[in-house]
Amino acid sequence: MRAQVNSPTYTGGLWRKDRAAIVDPARLVWGLKTAAMSLGVRIYEDTKATSIEKDGVGVLVNTPLGRVRAGKVALATNAFKPLLNRIGHYVAPVYDYCMVTEPLTNAQLAEIGWTNRQGLSDIANQFHYYRLTEDNRILWGGYDAIYFWRGKVNTELESRPETWAKLSKHFFDTFPQLEGVKFTHMWGGAIDTCSRFCVFWGQAWQGRVAYAIGYTGLGVASSRFGGEVMLDLLDGRRSRATETKFVQEKPLPFPPEPFRFIGIQATRWSLDREDKTGKRNLWLRGLDRFGLGFDS
């Protein structure tokens, strides 16, 4: 492993060359936007959908500036406030944070190797993920998965100095050769976590509304599949996917507050403890038994 990427923290690793790839999420979204608009799709950015309601045989979408009437609605609200109350039982908005270094010099790159430029992740419960950018910076993120009281989501929470400090320490523990390298960009964002760690689907209002949600940070790779299944459900079309147990079943719901907040904090503490000791405590074993989990 250290012949590929030189870190004193590595004792082994697995390099998957056939089923993994690195994708720039921003460029992917911009490309999808261009493709959609070329097909006649109209996109109204920064227009907040505040609620939906039944409208005859269709659906009415309310916004601060007006209303949209539609025969059917596909909901992809992610970590933001769900427009169907039932979704809120299954999804918890969790903040994930990233940092990016200044461009590395050739000498610094030589110190760490990484000539094959793989995307990397460790296998801890509270894991880190990292990759090299086109201009030889290191994007470094993960570990902290922060749930705020009552699922709070706003732009103020996208900056968290205590997380930056923690991630910075972990970075230099992993690459002590890079001590002194500066971080030039830091940000955070909310993801839609559910107890089974991957997307789930549902319908409402006699099939007029369908949703795909709960990607738990895996949406860049799987949202195309999630969207296709959601559209099949919305059209009432049976497919191989819609007939599977995976699509038809939902994750176990999270408990209401304050038990949701307390439970998530207890789970984070327990996961961190397992990463340090290698032992899974009674709390985590209980969650395993009931098929519950928490992650980013």
Region roles according to the model:
Residues 205-210, 216-296:
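C-terminal lid/capping helical subdomain adjacent to the catalytic/cofactor pocket in oxidative enzymes
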